[in-house]
């Protein structure tokens, strides 16, 4: 008998999977920072809710669902996708670099939020680019130079990025002014949450 290379008899909740680090949890979302080293694999885990995934850096993985065939996936820096609830799988990093991403679970209450308008540049040099727009969330890329500032409205998650991962992640309530706190350009991702007006 051939042994399953991706055993999934024992399934853990995503928050108990050690490569998924829970960084924000509230009534609307749970946000995880994920890092899987080359050759490493996750425990078999369950995604109970729809989720957005933003990829940091290039990566190659095998996603092996509990009931289905393993599939090789290639991601590029900045890829963003929405996945439906219910996936139970093992993820194996078959690439040569760490597979890093930010995963935001959309809890049922997120539908009660009203999404604010897109960020408004209020100073300096800022480029805002939409990379995902859906019914319950919008994901935007922000490139901010040292003098750059943007104003946001509504509930959101602000993620500042480094070349090799996440520098900071924070939950925003209501109006906020975001700026570059460095003498070099800053790359950030903004997850705006809730339904559109």
Predicted segments, located by residue:
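Loop/turn positions that initiate beta-strands
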Residues: 78-79, 170, 174-176
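Hydrophobic alpha-helical transmembrane segments of multi-pass integral membrane proteins
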Residues: 44, 179-180
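Residue-level "contact hotspot" at macromolecular interaction interfaces
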Residues: 35, 54, 71-74, 171
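Noncatalytic accessory or regulatory domains flanking protease catalytic cores in secreted, cell-surface
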Residues: 88, 176-178
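Short, conserved beta-strand element in jelly-roll/cupin
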Residues: 46-62, 144, 151-167, 171
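A short, N-terminal "cap"/entry segment at the start of jelly-roll beta-barrel domains
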Residues: 1-33, 41-43, 63-65, 70-84, ...
């Amino acid at each position: 008998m051939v042994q399953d290379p991706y055993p999934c008899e024992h399934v853990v909740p995503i928050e108990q999977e050690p490569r998924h680090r829970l960084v924000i949890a509230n009534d609307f979302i749970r946000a995880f920072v994920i890092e899987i080293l080359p050759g490493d694999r996750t425990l078999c885990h369950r995604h109970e809710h729809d989720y957005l995934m933003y990829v940091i850096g290039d990566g190659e993985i095998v996603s092996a669902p509990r009931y289905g065939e393993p599939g090789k996936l290639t991601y590029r820096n900045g890829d963003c996708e929405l996945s439906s609830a219910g996936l139970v799988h093992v993820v194996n990093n078959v690439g040569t670099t760490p597979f890093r991403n930010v995963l935001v679970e959309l809890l049922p209450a997120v539908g009660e939020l009203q999404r604010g308008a897109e960020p408004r540049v209020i100073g300096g040099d800022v480029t805002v680019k939409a990379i995902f727009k859906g019914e319950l969330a919008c994901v935007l890329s922000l490139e901010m130079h040292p003098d750059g500032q943007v104003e946001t409205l509504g509930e959101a998650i602000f993620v500042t990025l480094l070349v090799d991962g996440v520098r900071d992640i924070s939950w925003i309530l209501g109006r906020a002014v975001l700026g570059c706190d460095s003498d070099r350009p800053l790359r950030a991702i903004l997850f705006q949450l809730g339904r559109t007006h």
